Amino acid sequence: MVNQALKIANISKEQVDAVAFTRGPGLMGSLLVGTSFAKSFALALNVPLIDVNHMQGHIMAHFIDEGQEMPEFPFICLTVSGGHTQIVVVKEHFNMEVIGETIDDAAGEAFDKSAKILGLQYPGGPLIDKYAKQGNPTAFKFTKPRVKDLEFSFSGLKSNILQLIQREQKKDVDFIEKNLIDLCA
């Protein structure tokens, strides 16, 4: 994979100035593998090793492209992914403060788990979005999370969907198929 990445970048190993890796947050197994490889690769090349915060990387990646206008600090950013949902005050490039986040499942995780309940393929978020555009958002009522301040909670929505499906499939085994777009909306 490294050779392929170097080929795409049109550089040789000797032209690598530093090795960057994600130190977290994230899944422990992936972080350990990435960290171990990055340390070994940097050591072999005798170049500096740079650790990067995963969520800071997501936020600042939007400003990497040449010609892209740099942001005016401070700004507020909503980061939503499979594993994280956060509101972040970005004070400077490496000075960020999380002011709100999920207390349970991240939004992306809730989408993927709900999609699985509905029998949709992974990743489920894009499929739910596609079907939701065609559906009736008022066809089904789900409870709203009770959270404080700038917190998020998505586990209740996932549980509501599961309970609704289990209850309605007892009456009609084709319930999901007949109501998919409205369930997604």
Per-region residue spans from a language model:
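Short glycine-aspartate micro-motif
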Residues: 18-20, 30, 70, 75-79
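Glycine-rich phosphate-binding loop plus the immediately following alpha-helix
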Residues: 91-134, 158-169
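Conserved phosphate-binding catalytic cores of ATP/NTP-utilizing and phosphoryl-transfer enzymes
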Residues: 52-75
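A contiguous, well-structured pocket-lining segment that forms one wall/lid of small-molecule binding clefts
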Residues: 129-185
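Short, acidic/small-residue loops that bind anionic groups at enzyme active sites
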Residues: 38-58, 102
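Short beta-strand scaffold segments in enzyme catalytic cores
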Residues: 77-79, 85-89
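Phosphate/pyrophosphate-binding loops at sites that engage ATP/ADP/AMP, CoA/4′-phosphopantetheine
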Residues: 2-17, 167-171
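Short Gly/Thr/Asp-enriched flexible loops that form oxyanion-binding sites at enzyme active sites
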Residues: 21-45, 65
